[in-house]
């Protein structure tokens, strides 16, 4: 089963990815993990990627695509895979089609976890962190017993700058604009399946599991 997982920041991709790979016995392949593994193994492409990352530059598409090609060609992908964080653009999606064609494979589903912007804002701006011990809370989903005070150590809670409304709103807008052409591409291909991510996480996974046909034997 060859899957691509999509969703905006805060949509809950990580939680659902963990469940899918555990239930269906396929590797969870994220862009970050691929880069780290290629750099650790010191492959030619891994070393090339490292040279860009060390300079704080974006890794060019041809290097990223080469690393994806190497990773999908490994034995643990014979029974399928879950791609997360790749592709990000239509050009990368077209390259992925060519990679899979060369491996005699194709995408089964592109799972897009949909959550509206207001709900994402609530999820992403509600996080609070203890200045003292680093414990994480959420004003709605996991609030401290006493406002702005850590349950564990009594330290003061704060909101990271990245989590304020203006920053989160901008990040979501940028992601939406970047993601839409990719969603259109996969919808035209007939791969795209939208999953309602505003339900409880167990209900979201039940919908995904139903799509995938229950537990893979």
From Swiss-Prot:
GO BP: any one term: AMP salvage
Catalytic activity: AMP + ATP = 2 ADP
Keywords: ATP-binding, Cytoplasm, Kinase, Metal-binding, Nucleotide biosynthesis, Nucleotide-binding, Transferase, Zinc
Lineage top rank: taxon: Bacteria
Positions of Zn(2+) binding: 130, 133, 150, 153
Compartment(s): Cytoplasm
Keyword Cytoplasm set for record: yes
EC assignment: 2.7.4.3
CDD domains: ADK (cd01428)
Region (LID): 126-163
Entry's Gene Ontology cellular component terms: cytoplasm
One function term, GO molecular function aspect: zinc ion binding
Ligand binding (ATP): 10-15, 127, 136-137, 199
Positions with a binding annotation for AMP: 31, 36, 57-59, 85-88, 92, 160, 171
Pathway(s) per entry: Purine metabolism; AMP biosynthesis via salvage pathway; AMP from ADP: step 1/1
Principal subcellular localisation of the protein: cytoplasm
Domain notes for this protein: Consists of three domains, a large central CORE domain and two small peripheral domains, NMPbind and LID, which undergo movements during catalysis. The LID domain closes over the site of phosphoryl transfer upon ATP binding. Assembling and dissambling the active center during each catalytic cycle provides an effective means to prevent ATP hydrolysis. Some bacteria have evolved a zinc-coordinating structure that stabilizes the LID domain.
Cited function: Catalyzes the reversible transfer of the terminal phosphate group between ATP and AMP. Plays an important role in cellular energy homeostasis and in adenine nucleotide metabolism.
PANTHER family: NUCLEOTIDE KINASE
Family: Belongs to the adenylate kinase family.
Subunit structure: Monomer.
Protein name from the UniProt record: Adenylate kinase
